[in-house]
Amino acid sequence: VFNHCGSFNKWMDRERIYEGQEGYAPGAYVDEKSPYRSFFKFHSEKWPYNKDYDGWWGHDTLPKLNYEESESLCEYILRIGQKWVSPPYNVDGWRLDVAADLGHSPEYNHLFWKRFRKAVKEANPNALILAENYTDPASWLEGDEWDTVMNYEAFMEPITWFLTGVEKHSD
């Protein structure tokens, strides 16, 4: 999942698993000088142990990654995108969870996924980029971002109607 991580991830370390451990830099929750601080959006300067950060859908156990303000995070994720589709791993592509929710704006999301596609396709032109999307995917499928989508609502709506006669399952 590229739009958030777990609060236990070494980048955040809310559970303080890595705090004081040899070989680990302090997490962004633990120390304002953490090398990972820019990976997250904090709303206060309450360190140590700053609980005031964006969580995916408001969940503090799922800290939302802050691509817009961290070029180092972007570059790190782009390298991951390339690494796994290259030798010796040679995976066939990427399945992107909640891809349209990556950043804080649709405009930024489109910019990032264009960069991601370019990086992945440079490493492996045949790699597939499959994104989870739950709205109209047309703007993402213009040949410069995702190759295809999986859409739970588009699948569930007709199945639910067929099985139950209920027109919408997601109200």
Q: Can you name each region flagged by the protein language model?
A:
Residues V1-D171:
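Active-site and adjacent substrate-binding regions of carbohydrate-active enzymes
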